[in-house]
Amino acid sequence: MPSHSLLVGYHGCDRSLVESVVAGKDDLKPSQNAWDWLGHGIYFWEDSCARALRWAEAEPQRRASRIKTPAVLSAVIQLGNCLNLTETEPLALVKDAHEAYLQFCAASGSPVLENRGTALQVRFLDCAVIETVHQFRQEEGNQPFDTVCGFFVEGRALYPGAGFRELDHIQVCVRSSKQIIGYFLPRST
């Protein structure tokens, strides 16, 4: 799980935030939404500037948004101790965390959260399970995960019967901002 791999991530946001972060006046804030599918942290699209811009352009239409002028911030990210959900061993951790989450809900009388939306884009259950993984690591004294990576299936099928979708992508959630080596502006967006 520890990785010295570097990747380029792209974060869709407002141009004013891009300029402020690149100038060293501000930092990206971790998302703490209950539906963040990879848990809480700073989200990036891996190697997809165009996808980050597309998200930033669509975001103001979805809800009250701070994005007035869509833009993209690029970052060099070192994965560090990564919960990589494209690998078998980390997926087993997540499966175990789901079982523990269900047991907690049963014991406490709490409702089990569900993923919602036509494409399951509101991921309450996934967020709760990923946060359970992090909680267990902390309770057991294990090294925390710095980042979480996952493959997100999104959009319409590329062609009839396709397993590929128009908006499929790899997303990275940075939990420890020290893994962000630096920010830069993409050449064009």
PLM features per residue range, with description:
Residues 18, 27-38:
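Internal mixed beta-strand/loop scaffold within catalytic domains of large alpha/beta enzymes
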